[in-house]
UniProtKB/Swiss-Prot annotation:
UniProt feature coiled coil, ranges: none
CC terms in the record's Gene Ontology section: ribonucleoprotein complex; ribosome
Similarity comment text for this entry: Belongs to the bacterial ribosomal protein bL31 family. Type B subfamily.
Cross-referenced InterPro entries: Ribosomal_bL28/bL31-like_sf, Ribosomal_bL31, Ribosomal_bL31_B, Ribosomal_bL31_sf
Protein name: Large ribosomal subunit protein bL31B
Keywords annotated in UniProt: Ribonucleoprotein, Ribosomal protein
Subunit structure of this chain's protein: Part of the 50S ribosomal subunit.
Organism, scientific name: Burkholderia cenocepacia (strain HI2424)
A Pfam family of this chain: Ribosomal_L31
One GO BP annotation of this record: translation
Keyword match Ribonucleoprotein: yes
GO molecular function: structural constituent of ribosome
């Protein structure tokens, strides 16, 4: 392997932001934050979903608020969206 061209492969703590679950694995991800875990400092990568919170693995469903998304879009961008569509 050529020196200096490969990313740093190191232990990183991934934290599930939906439930606070943390796990250590090896990764090349670049992060600015660090965390103290078991007396050692590791880079911290924050993630939205992990196997601890995903409905496929937990067997529980989370209800997402998707109702009214089209209406919100129309209220926010209605005039501009209609104007651009007509101009084409």
């Amino acid at each position: 392997m050529k020196p200096g061209i490969h990313p740093d492969y190191r232990e990183v703590v991934f934290q599930d932001m939906s439930n606070g679950f943390k796990f250590i694995t090896r990764s090349t991800i670049q992060t600015r934050e660090t965390i103290e875990h078991e007396g050692k400092t590791y880079p911290l990568a924050k993630i939205e979903v992990s196997s601890e919170s995903h409905s496929f693995y937990t067997g529980q469903q989370k209800i997402m608020d998707t109702a009214g998304r089209v209406e919100k879009f129309k209220n926010k961008f209605g005039a501009r969206a209609n104007g651009k569509a007509a101009a084409k």
